UniProtKB/Swiss-Prot annotation:
Family classification: Belongs to the eukaryotic ribosomal protein eL20 family.
InterPro entries: Ribosomal_eL20, Ribosomal_eL20_dom
Gene Ontology MF, one: structural constituent of ribosome
GO cellular component terms listed in the entry, alphabetical order: ribonucleoprotein complex; ribosome
HAMAP family listed in its UniProt record: Ribosomal_eL20
Pfam family, any one: Ribosomal_L18A
A biological process term (GO) from this entry: translation
Quaternary organization: Part of the 50S ribosomal subunit. Binds 23S rRNA.
Keywords, sorted A to Z: Ribonucleoprotein, Ribosomal protein, RNA-binding, rRNA-binding
Designated gene of the protein: rpl18a
Protein name: Large ribosomal subunit protein eL20
């Protein structure tokens, strides 16, 4: 199994306001990425899963990653 790089974009609602986000993760499958997004955004911003809306999950090349940690981990191997 090969670890892939995914870019996730969407928004979450808190206190009647909408906040956009774009995140990059390394994972084996899209389902794993969804779980990471819900866990990460929920814990950082104290938002319930039903208030997190994922618009797009896209697989990208490791070279396209903007997050330095994700890029370095992906290109090391």
């Amino acid at each position: 199994m090969e670890v892939k790089v995914f870019r996730v974009s969407g928004y979450f609602e808190k206190d009647g306001r909408k906040f956009k986000f774009t995140k990059e993760y390394r994972a084996l499958k899209e389902e794993h990425v969804k779980e990471l997004v819900y866990s990460d955004i929920g814990s950082r911003h104290k938002v319930k899963r039903r208030k997190i809306f994922i618009k797009e999950i896209r697989e990208i090349k490791p070279e396209e990653a903007e997050d330095i940690v994700v890029r370095r981990l992906s290109l090391e191997l």
